Amino acid sequence: MPILTQRSARVRDARKLTRRQGRAKAGLFLAEGPQAVREALAATARQRPGLVTDLFASPPAATRYADIVDAALAAGVSVHHADEPALAALSETMTPQGLVAVCRLLSVPLDAALDGAPHLVAILAEARDPGNAGTVIRSADAAGADAVVLTRGSVDPHGGKSVRASAGSVFHLPICADADLETTIAAARARGLHVLAADGAGDLDLDEAEATGLLARPTAWLFGNEARGLPSTARELADEVVRVPIYGRAESLNLATAAAVCMYASARVQRRVR
């Protein structure tokens, strides 16, 4: 098998996917590292044939992760050996692990993301930090959420930092990107979801929300921008505004931590009452 370099056409085309514009134009994104690639291939085998189109592997990585290469070949994925500089050009990390998969974009329409009878949904309103977005997706997956929606003005969940921070969870649950905020809230409510906005100035704290039975209801949690918090529209349209209680001296929690606390609080109560 020939070894591709940075000048190879396939590598040059794949490198365009490190930018949001390139991903949108091609309808593709990159998943880097063995964990992400394994989950992408598992999703391909489980329910999304054709999700992974290509796999780039350095010769050492192809040997070290022979099981991943074999799974890719079995799924009909085009496997390419590439040298270390080529893999580094496709990576956004300081220490590339030698495996990069090219995948089809995951974002689905809002109706598809909220299909069925969802019990727990996370909505990110104008979240800009890719690491936070990926971590929220990971936490939503761990809490058993049915979907994650990112509204217009939010970071692209297909970016390298978001995909890495999700630790493969982007392949586990429906994700809708670039959704209209008001339309999203209306759609969530139409599916019987109680819309709770997480905000440090909320009228209720999370303990009170649990004590009153609020968390037992099917819920869409709204989380805002890391610096500015929730858009005023989100606060106005939410059914309740809830704050995470701070028992110590910390000024606040960051977005990803607050989201994990809120979603797990809902998941724990919902699992008891189902």
Where are these regions (language model features)?
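N-terminal positively charged helical leader segments and presequences
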Residues: M1-E92
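Glycine- and other small-residue-rich loops at beta-strand/loop junctions that grip anionic moieties
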Residues: I3, F29, A125-E126, V149-R152, ...
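Amphipathic alpha-helical repeat scaffolds
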Residues: G33, D129-T135, L253-A258
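Short glycine-rich anion-binding loops that position phosphate/pyrophosphate groups of nucleotides
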Residues: P34, P60-A62, A86, L106, ...
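RNA substrate-binding interface of SAM-dependent RNA methyltransferases
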Residues: A74, P85, C103-V108, A113-G202
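Generic beta-sheet signal
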Residues: L99, H119-A122, R217-G224
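Structured adenosyl-cofactor binding patch, chiefly the S-adenosyl-L-methionine
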Residues: A101, S139-A143, S154-V170, S232-R274
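Active-site/ligand-binding-proximal alpha/beta "capping" segment
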Residues: L196-A250
